[in-house]
Amino acid sequence: LTTVELGYKALSLFAVAAYPRPSDLARLSRDRFEKLAHGVRYRYFGTKELRAVPKFTGQHGLGFEMQELVCPASALEAYIDRTADKSVFFHSDSVYPFEHVFMSQTPARYGTYKGMHHPVGAQTCSRWMKEVMTRAGITGYSGGSVRMAAASAAVDNGVPIDEVLRTGRWSSWRVFNQFYNRSKLRAVVPLVGRTSLA
């Protein structure tokens, strides 16, 4: 993959794994990430909370080659490693003077800066995610609705509701169903947390 394609991939897979907003992705700092043997750990946006994105292993039901292709932690590690050269990749800007993770290549029309990579903003992150979703055949969602698209697709594909709620960190089925659920099974009311039908 080219660096730009790897950026799209890393950003999109991380967005699906961690569900940040595009503005959080744009402000994501390199010093918040720590590589681990089993994945990556990062400080959650604006807090001191540590979260981990594990590397895919056998429990996902995918072959080894497929796991490597869709693993968010591996894609993010590869992107951070590839964009470490500060002579080509300008990690900071005047608005947020820290080392950004995601960058975009400057178009040829900018002369001396041609080919250089600069930090991206929230709109670029959103556009990248929307483009990846469109290429994957997921239409009707904005770049900021990766969490909603993933959860709705999971419901459509028969993933248990309690697993969808837990994985997506939804506060309740009612909130998810009322405001975010776009699945074909919207009218289905699960028995999450109930012990009887009464």
Where are these regions (language model features)?
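N-terminal core-binding DNA-recognition domain of tyrosine site-specific recombinases/integrases
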Residues: L1-V4, V120, G140-Y141
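Short, charged phosphate-coordinating catalytic segments
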Residues: A15-R41, K86-F90, P160-R166
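Conserved tyrosine-mediated DNA breakage-rejoining catalytic core shared by Y-recombinases
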Residues: R27-A73, A78-D81
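Active-site/catalytic core of tyrosine-dependent DNA strand-transfer enzymes
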Residues: F64-I138
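Short, basic (Lys/Arg/His-rich) helix/loop patches that form interaction surfaces
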Residues: A122-R166, L185
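Catalytic-site neighborhood detector that most strongly recognizes the C-terminal catalytic loop/helix
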Residues: T167-G193
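C-terminal secondary-structure termini that scaffold catalytic or DNA-interacting sites
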Residues: R194-A198
